[in-house]
């Protein structure tokens, strides 16, 4: 008789059934870039993202070489292969939609403002929206106070607690320091030079909900400012985002990475001072016996942290940020008005 060698092959349908869940779990659509520039402000931006999928043909070829072609009579029961993942390029890349150097995320900062009163939440939302989409040119020093402009009821702000004249009082725009604090954190992480930064007079609980003490930045127009320099050689884009469920503010800074590496040290508390005893002040406008808290206790502390920025293994920025927080007294108004 004629001795014909057997012809081995895979059942294509069964192989496709096996590989389909694997492909579905790995597949990711590419994302086209979005960049809209109107009235000197970026109104919409999304960087392009590569997608990914698996190379089915390469998997089949590997299986053939590892099994049927190698030893058709002894297919291994347990065998592993590396899944070849290939990149899918978007049709519209970030480089195609702008020539300003806005390519990638170079720094991000976050903060929580849970337990804020309604007006404070409103002010944080308003102020952060007014910084959203700002472009900072190469070599430019960005001023938060200048960018926000007038902070008052005339520009849409509501009354919430501010630090003024050594007291915590209701004032227009209470909460805007949440915005400057969060942008400060983003600039720190981006490795940008901090030209001016001022701590708060006392430790504010909002800024320590998800952060150690000392990483805050106060602003108070016109003299207390946060200033950041763009030394990257390309434009940078500031974007803000609020998660309404978590009451979390995020600032993202986009630009062109030049490979700088940032190391931020853990804040160190070198001394602490207990808060003064609670003060009660008689108030004839409040019903007798009623208490109203108008200032909140906070221990004093001296805090510092360092930041080192390296590029090509050389230190290009070395800062120390120091905060001297005063001990703060809780104050209650005590009603004396007779019915």
Q: Where in this protein do the model-derived segments appear?
A:
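Short, compositionally biased low-complexity segments
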Residues: 1, 31-42
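A cross-kingdom signal targeting lumenal/periplasmic-facing segments of multi-pass membrane
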Residues: 1-23
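Short coil/turn segments at secondary-structure junctions
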Residues: 2-6, 47, 164-167
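Well-ordered beta-sheet/strand-loop patches within structured domains
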Residues: 17, 21, 27-29, 36-38, ...
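Short, hydrophobic beta-strand segments
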Residues: 42-50
């Amino acid at each position: 008789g004629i001795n014909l060698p057997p012809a081995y092959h895979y059942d294509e349908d069964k192989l496709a059934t096996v590989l389909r869940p694997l492909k579905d779990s790995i597949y990711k659509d590419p994302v086209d870039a979005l960049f809209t520039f109107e009235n000197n402000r970026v109104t919409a931006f999304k960087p392009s993202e590569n997608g990914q999928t698996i190379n089915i043909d390469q998997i089949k070829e590997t299986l053939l070489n590892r099994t049927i072609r190698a030893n058709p009579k002894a297919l291994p029961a347990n065998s592993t292969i590396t899944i070849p993942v290939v990149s899918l390029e978007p049709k519209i890349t970030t480089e195609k939609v702008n020539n300003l150097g806005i390519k990638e995320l170079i720094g991000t900062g976050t903060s929580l403002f849970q337990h804020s009163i309604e007006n404070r939440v409103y002010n944080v939302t308003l102020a952060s929206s007014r910084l959203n989409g700002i472009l900072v040119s190469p070599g430019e020093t960005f001023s938060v106070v200048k960018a926000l402009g007038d902070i008052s009821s005339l520009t849409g702000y509501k009354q919430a607690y501010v630090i003024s004249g050594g007291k915590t009082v209701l004032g227009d725009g209470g909460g805007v320091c949440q915005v400057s604090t969060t942008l400060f954190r983003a600039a720190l992480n981006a490795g940008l030079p901090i030209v001016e930064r001022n701590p708060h007079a006392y430790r504010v609980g909002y800024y320590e909900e998800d952060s150690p003490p000392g990483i805050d930045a106060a602003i108070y127009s016109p003299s207390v400012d946060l200033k950041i320099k763009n030394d990257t050689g390309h434009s940078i884009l500031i974007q803000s985002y609020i998660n309404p469920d978590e009451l979390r503010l995020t600032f993202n800074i986009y630009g062109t990475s030049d490979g700088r590496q940032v190391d931020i040290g853990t804040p160190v508390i070198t001394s602490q001072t207990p808060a003064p005893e609670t003060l009660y002040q008689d108030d004839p406008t409040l019903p007798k016996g009623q208490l109203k808290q108008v200032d909140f206790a906070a221990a004093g502390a001296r805090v510092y942290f360092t930041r080192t920025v390296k590029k090509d293994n050389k230190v290009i920025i070395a800062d120390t940020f120091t905060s001297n927080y005063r001990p703060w007294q809780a104050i209650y108004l005590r009603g004396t008005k007779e019915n």
